[in-house]
Amino acid sequence: MEKNLSSRDDDALHSLSAPSSSYNSIYDLLHYHERGNGLTINGKPSYSIEDAGDQITRDNVSWNGANVFGKSANLTFKFLQSARSTPDGDTGFVKFNAAQISQAKLALQSWADVANVTFTEVTGNQSANVTFGNYTRDSSGRLDYGTQAYAYLPGSGSASGTTWYNYNVDNIRSPDTMEYGRQTLTHEIGHALGLNHPGDYNAGEGNPSYSDVTYAEDTRQFSIMSYWSEKNTGGDFKGHYAAGPMLDDIAAIQRLYGANMTTRTGDSVYGFNSNTDRDFYTATSSSKALIFSAWDAGGNDTFDFSGYSNNQRINLNDGSLSDVGGLKGNVSIAEGVTIENAIGGSGNDLLIGNNADNTLRGGAGDDVLFGGSGADRLYGGSGRDTFVYTAASDSKVAAPDWLLDFQTGADKIDLSALNTGNNLHFVNQFSGSGGEIMLNWDASANTSNLYLNLDNNTSPEFLVKIVGQVSQTADFVV
C-alpha cells in the first residue's frame, strides 16, 4: 500500500537509501513537536491536543452548569463603574480606561470566534456574566505592585465570572500598545468562561515553575492559559505574546461550548493582505510578529507570509506548527481546520501542503515545496527551488499537480523518496517492470508530462504536469 507523507505516517519515511536534504527538511517539519501517543518530553507526559483541552477544562464548568459540554451560551459583559473591593479583598478600584475597554472587547471577540458563545454589553444596574474592573491596593490597603490579574470561573456566586486587573502595572493600563496586557485580558476571560491553567498552579501560591507542570505542552506556545515560556517546548516568540486563543485553548473552549462554524466561511487570508479583520491575524509590515492559531470554518483560505525575508517553515496540516517571520513555532492550525494555500517570503522557505488541492507559492529565495496529496498548483518563484514527491499518491494521473513556473537548469524535481530500491530509471515507454520514469514533452501545449510506473504493469500511477520543457539530465534528484 502506498503511503502519503502528508498523513505523517512513519511507515512512509523508512528505508530510504539516500534521502535528499530537501526530503529531510520536510520530514523534520512534519515531525515538529509530535505529541501524545505515550511520548515523554522534558520528563513530562506529552498530551494530544484533545487531552490538553480536557486538562484545561478539568473542572468541567461553564455558564451552562457542571458537566455540560458542547452547548452554546449567550453571555453578557460589563465594565464596572465602582466596587468597594474585589472578592479577594483588594481595594483602590479604578474603572477600565478607553484602551482597556477596546482591547477587552477584542479579547472577547477572539473567544467568540472559535466557540459558540456570544457577548452582549450591559450597563447600569444590570447583572452580567463577565465583568471587568481594576484594583490598585491589596487587602491591607498597601499599593500592590506584586500581582497582575485574576478571575473567577463560571458559577452562581457573586464572584463568578468577575475579572480583576492591577492598574499599577504598565501593560494593564496600556494593553493597546503592550502585548502582555492584551494577552492578560484574553487569559482572564478564559477563566471567566471556564478554562483553568493547564496545571495546578497559581501566581499567588508559592513559586511555581515549569517543573510543576502536569504535561509537557503546558507552555504559551500551545495555550494562552499557561504561565510558561514557549521556549520550554522549542518555540521562540522573541519577547512577543499571543493575543488570541492558541491551539489547545481552542480545543478547550470548544469542549465546553462547541465550535463556531460560522467564523470565516469565505475565502480568508491570514498574514499579509489579511481580510480577517483581526489584528492578531494581520501583518502590515515585516516588523509585525504573528503569533496565532488559525480557526476557520470554510472557504478557500491562504497563509500569506510574503512580507518576511526570514527563512520560514510553513505547514498547512491541521494541528501543526510553523516558523513564520523569524519566530519559531509561532503559527498553528486548529484541529479540523483546512487552510488551502500558502505564500512564502523572500527567504529560503519550506512549504508543506495538506490533503486539499493546495496552491503553494515559494516567492523569492531557494524554496522547497511539498504539496502532499491533492491536485496541487506549485510556484517556486525566483531562486533555485525544489519540488519534492514522496509517494505516487502525491500526484495522481486523474488529478495531477502542476508546476507552473519551473525553471529548467535551476529548479529540481526531487523523487529520491520514491527511489527506495535504487531502481528508478528513465524509459521511453513503460515495459511493466516497475521503477520506470517517462518524461514527455508536448510542444504545442508547452507542457512536460512526468509519469511514474512504480508497480509491475504498464500503467502509470503518478503524473506531474510542468509548464515548459524539462531536462531529464539536469532537473531531477533521484
Swiss-Prot record:
Keyword annotations from UniProtKB, A to Z: Calcium, Hydrolase, Metal-binding, Metalloprotease, Protease, Repeat, Secreted, Zinc, Zymogen
Binding site for Ca(2+) 3: 345, 347, 349, 362, 364, 367
Signal peptide residues on this chain, from the entry's feature table: none
Hemolysin-type calcium-binding repeat residues: 343-360, 361-378
SMART domains per the UniProt record, alphabetical: ZnMc
GO cellular component terms given for this protein: extracellular matrix; extracellular space
Propeptide, chain numbering: 1-17
Main enzyme class: hydrolase
Chain residues that bind Ca(2+) 2: 299, 301, 338, 340
Binding annotation for Ca(2+) 6: 372, 374, 376, 394, 401
GO molecular function, one term: zinc ion binding
Listed EC numbers: 3.4.24.40
Binding residue positions for Ca(2+) 1: 264, 266, 296, 298, 301
Claim: Protease is one of the keywords in the record: yes
Biological-process GO terms, alphabetical: collagen catabolic process; extracellular matrix organization; proteolysis
Residues annotated as catalytic: 188
Transmembrane residue ranges: none
Binding site for Ca(2+) 7: 381, 383, 385, 411
Cofactor, how bound (note): Binds 7 Ca(2+) ions per subunit.
Annotated residues for binding of Ca(2+) 5: 363, 365, 367, 380, 385
Location in or out of the cell: Secreted
Domain notes: The Gly-rich repeats may be important in the extracellular secretion of this metalloprotease.
Extra facts: Could be the homolog of prtA from strain B374.
Record family assignment: Belongs to the peptidase M10B family.
Designated name of the protein: Serralysin C
Organism from which the protein derives: Dickeya chrysanthemi
Lineage summary: Bacteria, Pseudomonadati, Pseudomonadota, Gammaproteobacteria, Enterobacterales
